[in-house]
Amino acid sequence: MTRILKRLAAAACMTLTLSVAFAGQPLKIESITYEPQANVNGEQLLLNGAGLRTKIFFKVYTAGLYLKAPARRNTEAMAQNSAARVRLGLLRDVSCASFIDSLNDGIKANLQPAKEKAISAELEALRSLMRSIGDVKTGDIIDFDYSPDKGTTVHLNDKPVGEPIGGGRALYNAVLAIWLGDNAIDDGLKKKLLKSGD
């Protein structure tokens, strides 16, 4: 009996060791690699989850969610007032108009009219940044970042686009809701980003 218990304990230790070893490994989805950590305005973030966005039968992009603390529910992710990042890796060319329409639809589906009106100026500033990017191509990386000091920032292929947008966490949560909201654009992707779903 003692020998069996020792073997079970050894197996458990091995499983734990492997789990720890693989926890910090990069995650590759299609052609896009997500590092286990990201730095946003000096804050170290951890990859919370990542997945694939499909529309009809087409693979559109991959998405990764980086947070300061793990979140398994959308409310947990949105309650954090620390830095955060949503990274998109494009798997096909998308026109500027289509991209902005998708953002608008995702925000409107999850934001009450009064709350949308309260941040209308910030939302228009975000649309303006996206218009300045223009059409996006296969392989492009778009980051939607948030930090309490700067607000919401957008990067294209690791280069900043325009200036940071204020509006505090309200604007960024409106962006997060596109993928994490109760009416998220892709339920399967939402579950991957949260590693469980709501």
Residue ranges and their predicted role:
Residues 1-4:
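N-terminal secretory signal peptides that target proteins for export/translocation
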Residues 9-19:
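Bacterial N-terminal signal peptides
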Residues 71-149:
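Mid-length scaffold segments of soluble, non-membrane domains
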Residues 156-160:
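Short strand-turn-strand beta-turns centered on an Asx-Gly dipeptide
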Residues 161-189:
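Flexible glycine-rich active-site/ligand-binding loops centered on an Asp-His dyad
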Residues 187-198:
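Cysteine/selenocysteine-centered motifs that mediate thiol-based redox chemistry or coordinate metal-sulfur cofactors
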